[in-house]
């Protein structure tokens, strides 16, 4: 007998399937007749994908500048896995690890190459903060938690050190089994061409569609040749929207040139979650639908491609044996004015609305799902939401 059965779930290709869960894993797909302790009848009204993965968040609660709670940026918004992108370094990653053990959301970390992490904006201005031995020891202490490294390569961070911190980061990467390296780009120096030329296959450029002068497009609106070469080597592009790092103009132009992101991520923390312009991963994903990406393309960027980029081998796919991490959502026709980090706006016809998440077989209504469950009975989705609330095992409101 299965623990949970989702019947007639709609996939992003609009096919319908049953999904069975047992012992925290996906146990069966297709037309399923076997019994289950709990059954949720979705009747094709709700999309189900592999659990959404946000490849770039800041959720170390004790960070003095970029902080949030893992479940506030994760399970409450339909995101089952988050990767904190460099909030902690070797000095405070142990504390972060312990705090994440209490979260419903699966949390991983990209370790800041600065041992002090993000205690200030200029963590790489002092080269003494880059301690290769401390990084190696931290990775050895937390091999299943630290899934990569993070280096922020913009002028306010590196000070007078230019490209040198990135050269050190690449050496540290080689000493740690070539863990994925995420590199933040922003204002120069260092120049983006210098940064891109140092990167190799599997490295990740985050804030790839930022609107700053040091962007991936040249003044003529064409892709920089250094980025073309980097992509040919297997370097990956991550959105990392954030407060100041996403431009509709740059994203539209790049995507028109065929330069799509490998991963869509939020760079969310408490301030840009509450005050915008980020709000949630779902809203960032909706911006890419508005720009012209298809629903399957967008979902791939937060599931299979995100898992592959960070070597999360048990996540990102709706396949038997994978973790039972699922996001239940709908694509709603709701004209919405979306805003980027440059304060430019774009009218969207449709937005993604996460209703519930299942993490390792445990179910949670999202904040939006909970709010809509309190709808009037005439609402066309009310019966479905009631079914979700009644059917999900161990629905937990602890993240609120």
Give residue ranges: language-model regions:
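Divalent metal-coordination and catalytic microenvironments
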Residues: 9, 24, 45, 56, ...
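A conserved glycine-rich beta-strand in the N-terminal activation segment of trypsin-fold
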Residues: 14-21
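Divalent-metal coordination cores built from histidine and acidic residues
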Residues: 72-154
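Active-site core of metal-dependent hydrolases
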Residues: 151-254, 258-275
